[in-house]
Amino acid sequence: MPTFKLVLSDPMSGKARQFEVKDPLAQRFIGLKIGDELDGQVLKELIELPKGAKVKITGGSGIEGAPMHPGIPGPVKRYVLADSRPGYHPPKRGMKKKKLMRGNTISDTIVQINAVVVYPEGYAGPPAIPLGAKELQKEKKTEEAPAQ
């Protein structure tokens, strides 16, 4: 019985929301890889996405906190000599470090899945994740400022 935290980012609004994904919906994520796209209507019980929208898997992390790496095949854990992203940001150029990383495939040991909404081409409607109250107030203030 896998349970995931799905962090869904919306490029249109610049916002992200976190959802708790449990069975049977969580079973649909098992076996997917980084870069795979899922139909947005699968998540209709969590969030209302526009018709034709897709959800693209961009990464995640395991139960021990190790990030998923797109270059490691399968649902495995490996120690990798990392010198750049993803999963390691060296403080100095050229530095390398041995890091624990997960493979690119989602399994039941993954805790968090990162994903982004991919809108259909030519979509001009409202964003799937709306702006909050603070952002709306900021927009109103910026609209009022030039009118003075």
UniProtKB/Swiss-Prot annotation:
GO terms for molecular function: structural constituent of ribosome. GO terms for biological process: translation. One of its GO terms (cellular component) is ribosome. Keywords: Ribonucleoprotein, Ribosomal protein. PROSITE patterns: RIBOSOMAL_S6E. InterPro entries: Ribosomal_eS6, Ribosomal_eS6_arc, Ribosomal_eS6_CS. Belongs to the eukaryotic ribosomal protein eS6 family. PANTHER family: 40S RIBOSOMAL PROTEIN S6. NCBIfam families: PRK04290.1-2. This is Small ribosomal subunit protein eS6. The lineage of its organism: Archaea, Thermoproteota, Thermoprotei, Thermoproteales, Thermoproteaceae.
